[in-house]
Amino acid sequence: EKGDGNMKLIFAIVSNDDSSRVSKELTKNRFSVTRLATTGGFLMAGNTTFLIGTDDDKVDEVISIIGKHSKKRTQMVPSSASYGVGMYTSFPVEVQVGGATIFVTNIERFEKL
């Protein structure tokens, strides 16, 4: 099976907390997805990166599904500060987590063997 030049590859990085819902909804809407386990750099939290190949005219639908099922939320994470030589204290900091980071690229060639 070969694709024409009007296909896109969507990379969607989603929190593990949302990945099952996103995957289920994409599959229900007949999108083929590949899931990769990834780790974010800032919080070192587990993520799922979805690879989704689709026709150009379906990109907005994919992004809408991902957005609907990957919600932003706040979370308290430990942080530390120095208040003297060799003296540190730890305190919680509220950060925003979740949501999705999405990249859309052109596909030069697609073959399913």
Model-derived features: positions:
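Positively charged, small/polar-rich N-terminal and surface patches that mediate targeting and assembly
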Residues: K2-L113
